Amino acid sequence: MTKAPIAGNRTGRKLGQRVKNKKMKASSRQWLQRHINDPYVQRAQLEGYRARAAFKLLEIDEKHHILRGAKRIIDLGAAPGSWSQIAAKVTGSTDEDIRVAAIDFLEMAQLPGVKILQLDFLDPTAPEKLLEAVGGTPDLVISDMAAPTTGHHRTDHLRTMHLCEVAAQFAVEVLGEGGHFLTKTFQGGTERELLAMLKQNFRQVVHVKPNASRAESVEMFLLAKGFKGRKVEGDAEKA
């Protein structure tokens, strides 16, 4: 996730205002103007969320109810922390009773009730550290991870899909029965193996593109609901 201010409109500009800076490149000026005029950016600042991405999760939850009843949540690719803010609120997580663990290789400002790990999720030690940090079996694993873009669509898609696959495997290994998994992906085809694995392990698998995702963006989300649980060794042998 792209880093953003913690809260407040630090631009001092009103919605619809143009950006004037002769030294700034046209592309940068265009991006900044779009950012300033984005209604979700304005809402995030007004409501105290660290990023507009908060409304993607809230919109998905409004339709699919993945946050309801969640007691422990793991947030992958968490910076700057808007999803973790929501997770801490719905779980009632506090510094004395941590119920949310967040991980990102980017630095992330501290959040009440959230254990933050500044670490690459692909690090072999990450899964164990996340489980230890969250203090129990998670009901929900959410991932807004995306590989740094190269400008080559196919390469970017493949690199992000790899993160999706690793996150999905992690979710299957740690979720409690009935838990849910949400991950960012890019339009351009979800790998068959990933979909097959999710459908084998979850009761429902759907693609979602919330309104808060920019219309021109190839971003969408893959939601797997109702984890079926892990087979014990004896069950696998009988099958």
Curated annotation (Swiss-Prot):
Keyword S-adenosyl-L-methionine: yes
Major localization class: cytoplasm
An example Gene Ontology molecular-function term: rRNA (uridine-2'-O-)-methyltransferase activity
Reaction(s) the record says it catalyses: uridine(2552) in 23S rRNA + S-adenosyl-L-methionine = 2'-O-methyluridine(2552) in 23S rRNA + S-adenosyl-L-homocysteine + H(+)
Gene3D superfamilies per the UniProt record, alphabetical: Vaccinia Virus protein VP39 (3.40.50.150)
Keywords: Cytoplasm, Methyltransferase, rRNA processing, S-adenosyl-L-methionine, Transferase
Family classification: Belongs to the class I-like SAM-binding methyltransferase superfamily. RNA methyltransferase RlmE family.
Protein name listed in UniProt: Ribosomal RNA large subunit methyltransferase E
Species: Rhizobium leguminosarum bv. trifolii (strain WSM2304)
